[in-house]
């Protein structure tokens, strides 16, 4: 379905390669990486990709997920190229840990996007 809609889905195990492709030396160096600089990019983070130790508030907890630092680095790397951002699959019936993490990722997106548009 995603391919039909011209959407690139990055599996959790491929996230580190995307960070490296986008930034090379770390978040913020501005290389276009896996997409063209003029592409319209929308970054959607599914909380299910995170390890449940950090984000228990999700409908599908799977062990061996991503570390929050990896997701933060990916958000920072994509933000300068993105037109929008969201965090999905947050369960509101947990202790608020996943929601707090989602809010912090949103903050990282806003700051990184703003720095790139100066």
Go through each PLM region and give its residues.
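Active-site-proximal loop->helix
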Residues: 1-5
């Amino acid at each position: 379905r995603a391919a039909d809609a011209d959407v690139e889905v990055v599996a959790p195990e491929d996230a580190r390669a995307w960070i490296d492709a986008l930034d090379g030396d770390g978040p913020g160096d501005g290389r276009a990486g896996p997409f063209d600089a003029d592409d319209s990019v929308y970054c959607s983070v599914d909380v299910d990709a995170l390890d449940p130790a950090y984000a228990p508030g999700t409908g599908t907890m799977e062990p061996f997920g991503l570390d929050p630092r990896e997701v933060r680095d990916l958000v920072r790397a994509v933000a300068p190229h993105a037109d929008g951002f969201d965090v999905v699959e947050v369960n509101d019936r947990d202790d608020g840990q996943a929601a707090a993490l989602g809010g912090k990722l949103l903050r990282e997106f806003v700051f990184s996007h703003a720095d790139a548009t100066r």
